[in-house]
From Swiss-Prot:
This is Probable transcriptional regulatory protein CYB_1350. It holds the Pfam family Transcrip_reg. Coiled coil: none annotated. GO terms for molecular function: DNA binding. One of its GO terms (biological process) is regulation of DNA-templated transcription. GO terms for cellular component: cytosol. Signal peptide: none annotated.
Length: 249
């Protein structure tokens, strides 16, 4: 998906800037807290936590920050404002479906910020369930580099995965979310450079955005939402042709 590939590149570039101002660390810390709270507070026995910790380390988060986040998730750190996971749904410009995962200590603040992001870009925040039926949860393993797609196809099948999609010089491998750890572990064992492994919402249908102005508004919405400290992940079902993306560059 050209549009999604472009947005992924923008996010990677923005992450380097976010790391400097600390907002990336906030998001990574919250992911660790929730992973530790939902399972064992030990990365060796909690795949979700191990993946979150590895991602934090790759971003350069200090060890003491990681340890503090794990302690918070385990309930061993006093915190007057506990975090809770919330999900928002809405429609962006051109009828694009948008699903947002957030972690917040203040639902009212986060809802207001998300609503403003939609309204500023021509979208609208909807009710729970208005677009989630257009997505399905899948395990997604991001590989940094793939030299032989045919060999990867065989490895994915042997690991228990469903499919993969080449993204630039790398690839994204898809599997049942219950098999995420199994597939990621197998690919690592086979020498594949696993960059990330997470459960994501994958759109079952896509909206093709052909108008440049609409495409610009969609990307503006994605960026506004991703810039919010409380927002962890943003998913959308847009497809933007490469020619349209190039016209916006």
């Amino acid at each position: 998906m050209a549009g999604h590939s472009k947005w992924a590149n923008i996010k990677r570039q923005k992450a380097r800037v976010d790391a400097k101002k600390g907002s990336l660390f906030t998001k990574l810390s919250r992911a660790i807290i929730v992973a530790a709270r939902n399972g064992l507070p030990d990365p060796d026995g909690n795949f979700q936590l191990r993946a979150a910790v590895e991602k934090a380390k790759a971003a350069g988060m200090p060890s003491e920050n990681i340890e503090r986040a794990i302690a918070k998730g385990a309930g061993n750190w006093s915190d007057d404002s506990p975090l809770e996971e919330v999900r928002y749904e809405g429609y962006g410009p051109g009828g694009v479906a948008v699903l947002i995962e957030a972690m917040t200590d203040n639902r009212n603040r986060t809802a207001a910020e998300v609503r403003e992001a939609f309204s500023k870009t021509g979208g609208s925040l909807g009710e729970a369930g208005c677009v989630s039926w257009l997505f399905r949860q899948k395990g997604v393993i991001s590989l940094e580099e793939v030299l032989d797609p045919e060999a990867l196809l065989l490895a994915v099948a042997e690991a228990g995965g469903d499919d993969f999609k080449v993204e630039g010089t790398g690839a994204e491998v898809y599997c049942d979310y219950s098999l995420l750890e199994q597939v990621a572990t197998y690919l690592k064992k086979e020498g594949y450079p696993v960059q990330d492994a997470a459960i994501r919402w994958i759109p079952s249908t896509e909206v093709h955005v052909e108008d440049p102005d609409t495409a610009k508004s969609v990307l503006a919405l994605m960026e506004r939402l991703d810039n919010l400290d409380d927002v962890q992940n943003v998913y959308a079902n847009f497809e933007i042709d490469e020619a349209v993306m190039e016209s916006l560059a």
